[in-house]
């Protein structure tokens, strides 16, 4: 069956899991633009501890991300997702009940330890057919960007109207809603599909970690989230010092995010169609350097701060679209799922480092010092990015080998002789082949027919 139209079950799985993932991300990110300003009223709060509270969820998520993904193969996807969301909800309740910064730190640490991203992707693979899996994954990727923008706006509005504790109560409700959706809306899976494109494989991490091109991309996503977190440690205070009250910050985030979303699409099309990924990537890193310098130089100049935020969000949103695509292109055939697992871990380590380091610098110096340190880190990243090579413009394809055809080296040789095929991995235990094909070669799409 080569039907590219999603079945009702596939559509329900896609929007159901996409909503579950978005609710969790909404809860994580709504805190980001408000904790620096409203959190200082908590007992024992300091700039350094606020930074730890912002970043601690990244540390626990980095620790549990890969183990939970592998554990879902044993205990089942749904039980792990429900358990992870329950831990997330408990962490939110602890934060909501706490009047001290240490309670917030504990709550945020628990929020991060409910790492469900890998299990969500694995369950999505179980519930969608091969020909529709890419569309389903893309839906979740798009929902992530939209969720981030919504969180930047809702966080300040809710906190101003109801307070920081109410925000955490609302996050707990979001997590509970996610549990209900997982149990009663997301379809049950009767089988686990072993798919190296979306799941992590034991024993394959050494190969992924030994790839220099992937290491540079993992360094990049770590830097990007160090810069995101450290910037949001300093930015709310800088906007307040410029005479723009915390209750109005959502207006800056809404306007700049909308412009950023509109600006990203032409760059992505240009990078893919013209095969200029490296040039656009390096341009983005350079734009972040400029953004951090503008923020550093702004001091209490409101409109200069807005310009810096705008430049940062354009580069950030573009990077969030480019980096996963580059990981997919650069990962060896059959190792994309593992490569994405390492990528996600690097991302959350960046969250932890950015929050903690940004808070420490803000406490020792000031917000300008945070932006200056960010500009220096971005300059290092720019130097690393400039050494990158143009990625191979390939698409990944998983082919289920018919039962009457042997999954062996001879089949691999035959596939490699097909026009447009660049790389092949035969997974005998799955009786499948993982193929990298030239993105513009339409003839090679016959492999899947």
Positions of PLM-derived features:
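C-terminal ends and interior cores of transmembrane alpha-helices
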Residues: 86-99, 286-300
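Helix-loop-helix hairpin linking two adjacent transmembrane segments in secondary transporters
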Residues: 140-183
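Helix-to-loop junctions at the C-terminal end of transmembrane segments
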Residues: 65-76, 263-276, 362
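C-terminal membrane-cytosol helix-exit motif in multi-pass small-molecule transporters
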Residues: 173-192, 381-389
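Juxtamembrane intracellular "pre-TM" segments in multi-pass secondary transporters
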Residues: 2-10, 187-218
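Cytoplasmic helix-loop-helix junction between adjacent transmembrane helices
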Residues: 107-144
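Conserved MFS/SLC helix-loop-helix module at the cytosolic interface between two early adjacent transmembrane helices
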Residues: 63-99
């Amino acid at each position: 069956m080569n039907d590219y139209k999603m079945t009702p079950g596939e559509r329900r799985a896609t929007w159901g899991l996409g909503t579950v993932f978005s609710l969790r991300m909404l809860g994580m990110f709504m805190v980001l633009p408000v904790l620096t300003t409203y959190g200082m009223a908590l007992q024992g709060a300091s700039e350094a501890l606020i930074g730890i509270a912002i970043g601690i969820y990244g540390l626990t998520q980095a620790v549990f991300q890969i183990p939970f993904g592998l554990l879902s193969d044993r205990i089942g996807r749904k039980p792990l997702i429900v358990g992870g969301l329950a831990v997330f909800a408990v962490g939110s309740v602890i934060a909501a009940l706490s009047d001290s910064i240490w309670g917030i730190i504990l709550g945020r640490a628990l929020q991060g330890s409910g790492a469900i991203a890998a299990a969500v992707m694995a369950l999505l693979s179980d519930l969608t057919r091969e020909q529709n899996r890419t569309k389903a994954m893309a839906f979740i990727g798009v929902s992530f960007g939209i969720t981030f923008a919504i969180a930047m706006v809702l966080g300040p509005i809710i906190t101003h109207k109801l307070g920081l504790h109410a925000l955490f109560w609302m996050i707990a409700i979001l997590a509970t809603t996610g549990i209900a959706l997982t149990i009663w809306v997301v379809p049950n899976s009767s089988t686990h599909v072993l798919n190296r494109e979306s799941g992590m494989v034991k024993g394959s991490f050494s190969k992924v970690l030994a790839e220099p091109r992937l290491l540079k991309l993992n360094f990049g996503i770590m830097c990007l989230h160090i810069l995101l977190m450290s910037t949001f440690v300093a930015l709310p205070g800088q906007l307040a010092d410029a005479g723009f009250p915390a209750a109005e910050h959502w207006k800056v985030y809404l306007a700049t995010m909308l412009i950023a979303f509109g600006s990203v699409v032409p760059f992505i099309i240009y990078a893919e169609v013209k095969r200029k990924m490296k040039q656009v990537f390096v341009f983005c890193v350079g734009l972040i350097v400029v953004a951090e310098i503008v923020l550093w130089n702004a001091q209490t100049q409101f409109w200069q701060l807005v310009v810096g935020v705008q430049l940062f969000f354009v580069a950030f949103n573009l990077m969030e679209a480019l980096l996963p695509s580059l990981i997919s292109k650069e990962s060896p055939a059959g190792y994309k799922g593992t490569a994405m697992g390492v990528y996600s871990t690097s991302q959350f380590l960046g969250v932890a480092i950015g929050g903690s380091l940004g808070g420490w610098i803000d406490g020792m110096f000031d917000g300008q010092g945070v932006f200056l340190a960010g500009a220096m880190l971005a300059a290092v990243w720019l130097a690393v990015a400039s050494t990158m090579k143009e990625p191979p413009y390939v698409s990944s394809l998983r082919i289920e080998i018919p039962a009457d055809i042997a999954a062996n080296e001879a089949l691999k040789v035959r596939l490699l002789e097909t026009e447009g095929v660049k790389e092949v991995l035969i997974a005998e235990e799955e009786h499948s082949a993982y193929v990298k094909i030239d993105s513009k070669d339409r003839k090679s799409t016959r492999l899947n027919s």
